[in-house]
Amino acid sequence: MSEPILSVRDLSVSFPSEYGTVHAVSNLSYEVHKGEALAIVGESGSGKSVSSLAVMGLLPRNATVSGEIELLGRKLFTMDDGQLSTLRGNTISMVFQDPLSALTPVFQVGKQIAEVVRIHHPEVSVSRADRRAIELLEAVGIPEPARRATQYPHEYSGGMRQRAMIAMAIANEPEMIIADEPTTALDVTIQAQVMDLLKSAQEMLGAATVLITHDMGVVAGFADRVLVMKDSQMVETGGVDEIFYRPREEYTRSLLAAVPRVDLAESEGSKSIAGSALRHVADPAAGSTVSTPREQRPTVLEVEDLHRIYPITKGALVRRKIGEQRAVDGISFDIREGECLALVGESGCGKTTTLMEIMQLRAPQQGAIRVNGTEVQDLTRKERAALRSDVTIVFQDPMAALDPRMPIADILKEPMRVQGYTKERMDERVEWLLKTVGLLPEHAARFPTEFSGGQRQRVGVARALACDPKLIVLDEPTSALDVTVQAGVLAMLADLKVRLGVSFLFVSHDLSVVRHISDRIAVMRKGKIVELGDTEDVFSDPQHEYSRELLSAVPIPDPEIARQRRRDVIDRSAFKGVGGAAAGAGTAS
């Protein structure tokens, strides 16, 4: 076998803290060869991102590092900052998790890409570097690349910003690419496009690639080899087929088992690698263990012909209307007692606007919202305040939703205090709430910062349950959680739905999660509901083209299926540009 592009031997990284030394990476070793894609997989805190920063030489100064890292036979730990700078962006490049933070907001995107070319190839003229930037933007699939090159990062969508980051990463044809959670913040369809693009770029360049991720579905379609990390150490490594079909370690099996499968019904999923963890969550659409038929159960929430239109204005001193944005455009649905309706769609489709219209309990611009049969526009201020105990919400980011200065007991008591509960009843209720969401009574005295992400989300659910609501709105409640933690939260929600008879409006863009918690699905696009039906009907026989697009974009944790779905999406002719790639290539002399 040829010499590896990247060799990591016995890498250890630690940081000082007020509680002692934190060992972020312990004795990690691996190699990546030319044209090979290695995925480093693990949950938050496993050390995977720290290991990639060590390779790039981007660790903070207080880090203690030992071991050895070689890139093309050169020992990185013996290099100074100047020598490392000549490698970054030229021989080795990185695609970061948050492109908006990685791109400079005050410079045009094209200029930032051109700068990467000229830093490593000063002989290239400014005009040629600018043309090269346009060629690269065209190669990664950005429409109207000449115009887009003159725009700023905030004028790009999230997917376009990540495409621009990939263009920057491949500008000098690096030997090594590191991608750190490149699709975490993206919708499922954009995620699929970005991963196809990254794989196409890697294969075109023949670059060695390290993908850092916690998403096993993404790994299946990208990696040749997989390295699994837990608590700073390597648990298992092997070929992608070996890891997915014949995992040796229990932790690897648990990671795979926790991944929801969008392609399998539960009867099939229970036989698969990924079926076991969610088997006890719910059969798809079987969370309705309520024996009464749906039509005979009372309606908890009814939305009829709802509209929310925002004017588009222009002008500084005198603003004039030049158009309108139909954020919600005539949608209708209802939720019955003990039922979970999933509202799914990409960013900008109107999901969050719909959620806010419901939670504000105010008269809509047009249409009607009824809670327990009562029109919200007919409510007095006092009646509206009382109704807020019937409709509660669990937010996407549990840390931002909980007051860090309040102990958990006070957080749970706050909504009860507003509704006039007695002290004795609140104390009893706090203990019951903690037990109901799988926490311990002693957790009541702790603060949010003392909990993990999954535990904080359980606190958020407990707070939503505090006043016996009829409906809980769940706004992307598991999107910020690791896959194993996500499975536990989903299991808890499904159990609460069955045990307490509470109804859910589950807002999400993750169809694989939705299948295992919802009874019915409403698919939104551009402010409209394009499909509404029972979960299994939508998954097995989607009627709308957009529903089929969403389903086809969901990553499936099966390498064989993922390989069949892979597409080459990079424009190779645009990448080479007029006169070939040498004008901006890392191989230029």
Where does each model-flagged region fall?
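ABC transporter nucleotide-binding domains
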Residues: 1-265, 269-589
